[in-house]
UniProtKB/Swiss-Prot annotation:
Pfam families according to UniProt: EFG_C, EFG_III, GTP_EFTU, GTP_EFTU_D2, LepA_C
Database matches in SUPFAM superfamilies: EF-G C-terminal domain-like, P-loop containing nucleoside triphosphate hydrolases, Translation proteins
Protein name: Elongation factor 4
UniProt EC number: 3.6.5.n1
Source species: Staphylococcus saprophyticus subsp. saprophyticus (strain ATCC 15305 / DSM 20229 / NCIMB 8711 / NCTC 7292 / S-41)
Presence of the UniProt keyword Cell membrane in the record: yes
Functional summary from the UniProt entry: Required for accurate and efficient protein synthesis under certain stress conditions. May act as a fidelity factor of the translation reaction, by catalyzing a one-codon backward translocation of tRNAs on improperly translocated ribosomes. Back-translocation proceeds from a post-translocation (POST) complex to a pre-translocation (PRE) complex, thus giving elongation factor G a second chance to translocate the tRNAs correctly. Binds to ribosomes in a GTP-dependent manner.
BP-aspect Gene Ontology terms: positive regulation of translation
GO MF annotation: an example: GTPase activity
Membrane topology term: Peripheral membrane protein
UniProt domain tr-type G: residue ranges: 11-193
PROSITE patterns on file: G_TR_1 (PS00301), G_TR_2 (PS51722)
Length: 607
């Protein structure tokens, strides 16, 4: 392709992604766009086509982003190349959204005609505006009985400042308004900028591992041209590789001669280690490198940590391999080895939030066949010791003794909740109970209120979202962002079984709630841990002080069942023998702890 062809091609490229709150019909709209541009054979079409994981289809959510190239014959007679980059909608996967947006010039903002704007819609709009993207507003599901497109149009104008006239009304399910959306993409989304003659600059926005071909990186070319045979260099790591193949997704992978300015495709360069092709890195030519890497990609740090332990110890190395493979596609997943007296060897693993944690656990069990025990999640606490030293603690078992600590800081988040008027009281009460600090409240319209609180992250990660949903009959929507670490009066609570600490059950709690949480947990453990042949005391302790205690009664075993009549001394001898055996068993302290017991720490608020 010569210089002029590249310039001509560039003006007909449109790169866009679809952003929406979870369940507003984003994946269905992506399906309709694929269908209407005849990108997929009718026989290959299935719902949620771009959601390639079984888990995504089952839960009906998008977890991984996906990029696909489409051809569209517009009414002006020109043929346009669309690159659609599908994004997740759940708050935990904001980093996936920020990656997609960095590779686009425009975004279709999908809003449900019945639900209206929700908390995550706003969060994604702000992300899009940060990336200077053109917004194309679409009100979806207009054929629902409860749809109120005019009210939602007004909302878009009042809350986001979008002109009502620019809004497209559609129903992805019934294929209404899809043609208007395609025409609007041509009109609203600007063609990519960039010089095909300049040194190569390409953004890696996703990567996956293929056992035969190595790492396959999804890229968006910002400047220059890349083709097979080129020697490339990663700007963050300085590593060099030779390109073996470049191609596009249609949604199937298809190799092409070259990728030039504005193209979204994939690149394979015999990269064996995922760390060498990091998401957010810039690719350039080794011989003629670009001066500076691309800006605009945010590294997401894990917010929630938990221990993952294989039920069978011999799976330890397989678990490491599984985590490494998942980390390939998931730049925000972090892990390091840890050992626990109760659970043996495993990994302390960091996630973006609770849904992220659940999904990673489920993928390890499904895709790699490793059965896991997971400990209750915790967040990172900063401790300033009396010696002046500063320590970060992501595992409650490693918290220094209270008498050595000067101050403890815990992470706080700004939580934005959109709630119907009738439930404002219940939501505010929930936030106060979770140690929240009221910041602001504004009425969006006659029906809904936007409430903002600052809440400790440790209170949010447990079951805040579930409780918010149940307190509002499922109508609330929720989004949060990390703001800062703040000083808190926290203590570490240990759980003792049979007089021995179980490190995997330790947790950190606010001093004010220590007694009631300790009491709730020991009562819960009493019901979850099976009865042993001897009585087992369950205690909750803060430092040396026991704050709550209960006993798991022993299982009665009738050793006299085979004694029919006979001498009383014979019976006494059998009972003495049983007593000695129980004492020995108790000394060893082998209490079987089921997985539910470790998760009980999570569910303490539900009773």
């Amino acid at each position: 392709m010569d210089k002029q062809d590249r310039y001509n091609r560039r003006k007909n490229i449109r790169n866009f992604s679809i952003i929406a709150h979870i369940d507003h019909g984003k994946s269905t709209l992506a399906d309709r766009i694929l269908e209407n541009t005849k990108s997929v054979e009718t026989r290959d079409m299935q719902s949620q086509l771009l959601d390639s994981m079984d888990l995504e289809r089952e839960r009906g959510i998008t977890i991984k982003l996906n990029a696909v190239r489409l051809k569209y014959e517009a009414k002006d007679g020109e043929t346009y190349t669309f690159h659609l980059i599908d994004t997740p909608g759940h708050v935990d996967f904001t980093y996936e959204v920020s990656r997609s947006l960095a590779a686009c010039e425009g975004a279709i903002l999908v809003v449900d005609a019945a639900q209206g704007i929700e908390a995550q819609t706003l969060a994604n709009v702000y992300l899009a505006l940060d990336n200077d993207l053109e917004l194309l507003p679409v009100i979806n599901k207009i054929d629902l009985p409860a749809a109120e497109p005019e009210r939602v149009k007004q909302e878009l104008e009042d809350v986001i400042g979008i002109d009502k006239e620019d809004v497209v009304l559609a129903s992805a399910k019934s294929n209404i308004g899809i043609e208007d959306i395609l025409e609007k993409i041509v009109e609203v989304v600007p063609p990519p900028e960039g010089d095909p003659e300049a040194p190569l600059k390409a953004l890696i926005f996703d990567s996956e591992y293929d056992p035969y071909r190595g790492v396959i990186s999804s890229i968006r070319v910002m400047e220059g041209v890349v083709k097979a045979g080129d020697r490339i260099k990663m700007m963050a790591t300085g590593k060099e590789f030779e390109v073996t193949e470049v191609g596009i997704n249609t949604p199937k992978q298809l190799s092409v001669d070259e990728l030039t300015v504005g193209d979204v495709g994939y690149i394979i360069a015999s990269i064996k280690n995922v760390d060498d092709s990091r998401v957010g890195d810039t690719i350039t030519h080794a011989e003629r490198p670009a001066e500076a890497p691309l800006q605009g990609y945010k590294k997401m740090n894990p917010m929630v940590f938990c221990g993952l332990f294989p039920i069978d110890n011999k799976d330890y190395n397989d678990l490491r391999e599984a985590l490494e493979k998942l980390q390939l596609n998931d730049a925000s997943l972090e892990f390091e080895p840890e050992s626990s007296q109760a659970l043996g060897f495993g990994y302390r693993t960091g996630f973006l939030g609770m849904l992220h944690m659940e999904i990673i656990q489920e993928r390890i069990e499904r895709e790699f066949g490793i059965e896991l025990i997971a400990t209750a999640p915790s967040v990172i606490y900063q401790c300033i010791l009396k010696s002046g030293e500063e320590v970060s603690v992501d595992n409650p078992a490693n918290m220094p003794d209270r008498d050595k600590i000067e101050t403890i800081y815990e992470p706080f988040v700004r939580a934005t909740m959109m709630v119907p008027n009738d439930y404002v009281g219940a939501v505010m009460e929930l936030c106060q109970r979770k140690r929240g600090q009221f910041i602001n409240m504004e009425y969006m319209d006659d029906i809904r209120v936007n409430i903002i609180y600052e809440i400790p992250l440790s209170e949010v990660v447990f079951d805040f979202f579930d409780q918010l949903k149940s307190n509002t009959k499922g109508y609330a929507s929720f989004d949060y962002e990390f703001i800062d670490n703040k000083e808190s009066d926290l203590v570490k609570m240990d759980i003792l079984l049979n007089g021995e600490k179980v490190d995997a059950l330790s947790f950190i709690v606010h001093k004010e709630f220590a007694y009631e949480r300790g009491k709730t947990l020991v009562d819960k453990l009493k019901t979850l841990i099976p009865r042993q042949q001897f009585e087992v005391p369950v205690q909750a302790a803060v430092g040396q002080k026991i704050v709550a205690r209960t006993n798991i009664k022993s299982m009665g075993k009738n050793v006299l069942s085979k004694c029919y009549g006979g001498d009383i001394t014979r019976k006494r001898k059998l009972l003495e023998k049983q007593k000695a055996g129980k004492a020995k068993m108790k000394a060893v302290g082998n209490v079987e702890i089921p997985q539910d017991a470790f998760l009980a720490v999570l569910k303490m608020d539900e009773d």
